[in-house]
């Protein structure tokens, strides 16, 4: 029988060390699990940071935009009250004329110094979010105060311009400046700019759902879940601050408007087609007027805003209802109690004058938006349709006001080509959520009509013009 020799102490030590080495070296599967766990923690931390940054962005944007709204809403009634005394005080007219001339010169200088503040600011913001336009931090520092002051002066001067597009650009500018503080611009700057734009729209309209949809439907932004979280936190914070800190409520108190009865449902597609065609005509007129003024104006940039200001001066003492974006005008439509025939005679010239003045106000690279005038014109056209149907005894008399809402939705969607955003926007501004299903029908048919007429969305055309001008 062979006896096996016992191992020496040296061999025993080597064997133990080999086994110990095998125990301490992790397997590839263990390494992979550890790496996956580390990646999950990193993603969770990054998303948490994005959410916090989005919340801070929304709060900052709400403060800037609500300050703008407070300044405008406080000054505008005082100016109109002062102008209404022109019959008793002869010096009101020449003093206001001098003020508008100086305002036109100031705005011209402001636009010449900072060209990116011209217009609504939405096309510029879309180009930045898409990575097709790059702006330095120094430029953002100039854009924010220039847009704030420029839009305030132009709207208080009476031009038919809105605050909402400028609020989107100011929200993007506020977010871009905050992004520099995060020192994350290279990785998440465009996400924060989109979040600021959405927060700006939310604070301007009091419409968080529309602000969220606007980023993805109109700006055509594609973000990760972290980016969506940042935008969502921004609009939520902006909405809460606008509602509960600054106490802004509904822009159009139409929450008592009821949807059409079942027997009148067939009018919805008709309304969609009419508003779609009207939006196409306005789109072409807006671009045509803007291009014609740019080609044939005898004024330099310093004075290009003077002609619209002079028209605003005349209207201030003749038809002041068409001045400004039109929030008060839309709110007054629901209170019309005249017979349908008298209402039509009142609404038709008012709508034509508002359309013409809005087209002319947007010339000269004036800092100001087209969204609010667009909604006002849609409301006027909707009121015309409702009163016409009421006059023809096609519509029950108590439901004609519903067409004010559908006019706003259809006209907006025809121009912007964002049906979900347009529907959510009007519903959140008015509180008339009972009309939501019918408004969706009008929105999609208006969008289909505009597409069938092969008319590009208005912001696509304005965005293309900016790209061409910067290449030159």
Predicted features by range, described:
Residues 3, 7-472:
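Alpha-helical transmembrane segments and immediately membrane-proximal extracytoplasmic
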């Amino acid at each position: 029988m062979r006896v096996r020799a016992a191992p020496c102490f040296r061999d025993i030590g080597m064997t133990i060390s080999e086994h110990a080495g095998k125990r301490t070296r992790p397997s590839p599967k263990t390494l992979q699990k550890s790496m996956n766990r580390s990646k999950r923690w990193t993603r969770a931390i990054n998303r948490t940071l994005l959410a916090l940054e989005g919340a801070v962005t929304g709060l900052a944007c709400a403060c800037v935009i609500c300050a703008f709204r407070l300044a405008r809403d406080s000054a505008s009634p005082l100016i109109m009250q002062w102008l209404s005394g022109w019959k008793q005080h002869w010096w009101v007219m020449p003093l206001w004329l001098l003020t508008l001339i100086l305002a036109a010169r100031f705005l011209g200088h402001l636009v010449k110094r900072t060209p990116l503040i011209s217009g609504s600011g939405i096309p510029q913001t879309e180009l930045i979010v898409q990575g097709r336009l790059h702006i330095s931090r120094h430029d953002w520092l100039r854009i924010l105060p220039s847009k704030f002051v420029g839009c305030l002066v132009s709207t208080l001067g009476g031009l038919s311009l809105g605050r909402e597009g400028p609020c989107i650009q100011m929200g993007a500018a506020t977010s871009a400046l905050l992004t520099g503080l995060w020192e994350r611009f290279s990785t998440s700057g465009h996400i924060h700019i989109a979040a600021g734009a959405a927060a700006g729209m939310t604070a301007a309209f009091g419409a968080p759902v529309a602000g969220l949809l606007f980023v993805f439907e109109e700006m055509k932004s594609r973000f990760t879940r972290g980016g969506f979280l940042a935008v969502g936190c921004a609009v939520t914070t902006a909405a809460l601050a606008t509602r509960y800190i600054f106490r802004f409520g509904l822009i159009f108190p139409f929450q008592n408007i009821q949807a059409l009865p079942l027997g009148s449902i067939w009018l919805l597609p008709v309304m969609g087609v009419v508003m779609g065609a009207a939006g196409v005509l306005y789109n072409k007129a807006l671009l045509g007027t803007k291009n014609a003024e740019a080609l044939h104006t005898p004024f330099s940039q310093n004075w290009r805003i003077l002609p619209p200001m002079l028209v605003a001066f005349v209207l201030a003492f003749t038809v002041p209802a068409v001045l400004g974006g039109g929030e008060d005008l839309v709110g007054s439509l629901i209170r019309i109690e005249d017979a349908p025939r008298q209402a039509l005679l009142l609404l038709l010239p008012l709508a034509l004058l508002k359309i013409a003045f809005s087209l002319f106000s947007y010339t000269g690279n004036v800092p100001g938006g087209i969204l609010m005038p667009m909604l006002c014109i849609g409301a006027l056209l909707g009121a015309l349709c409702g009163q016409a149907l009421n006059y023809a005894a096609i519509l029950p008399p108590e439901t004609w006001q519903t067409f004010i809402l559908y006019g706003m939705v259809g006209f907006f969607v025809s121009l912007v080509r964002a049906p979900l955003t347009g529907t959510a926007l009007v519903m959140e501004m008015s509180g008339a959520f009972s009309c939501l299903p019918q408004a969706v029908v009008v929105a999609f048919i208006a969008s289909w009509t505009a597409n069938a007429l092969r008319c590009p969305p208005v912001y696509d055309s304005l965005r293309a013009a900016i790209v061409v001008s910067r290449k030159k």
